[in-house]
């Protein structure tokens, strides 16, 4: 029998597949399986929270329009029965408009950290991101930090 910790590790590996896969229908199938429909996601790209797997994927799709070769690589994770702390490496080339910034052609490589909270049904119900978006905005000249 699989432990809850092993289940949560498998969820995060499947989540990596969800955000990196190029087939939208497959991504949406995985999003429905992995993300609670009422899970709120806060992001600088929207003044209101985005909800559920479709909300989460809308951020992925925005990133893909702005960085056509965007990839997220799961570098490390620490998992318990209720959450997963994940370090991602995000790479891509800024070749589309991003938050009002015209394409620069700059390549980005950013380390991002997220905490994912997983309910008893094995669905992500909360995502708390560290400074990841700042790491994207800074090399594009969208923030002066």
Located regions from the model:
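A solvent-exposed, acidic/Ser-Thr-rich amphipathic alpha-helical stretch
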Residues: 28-84, 89-91
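Short acidic-aromatic low-complexity motifs
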Residues: 2-38
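Structural motif
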Residues: 38, 83, 115, 121-123
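Low-complexity, intrinsically disordered terminal/linker segments enriched in charged
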Residues: 125-145
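Short, surface-exposed coil-to-beta transition loops
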Residues: 71-72, 108-113, 129
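Extracellular/lumenal ectodomain signal focusing on beta-strand-rich modules
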Residues: 74-76, 115, 126
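Exposed beta-sheet edge and beta->alpha loop/turn motif
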Residues: 89-120
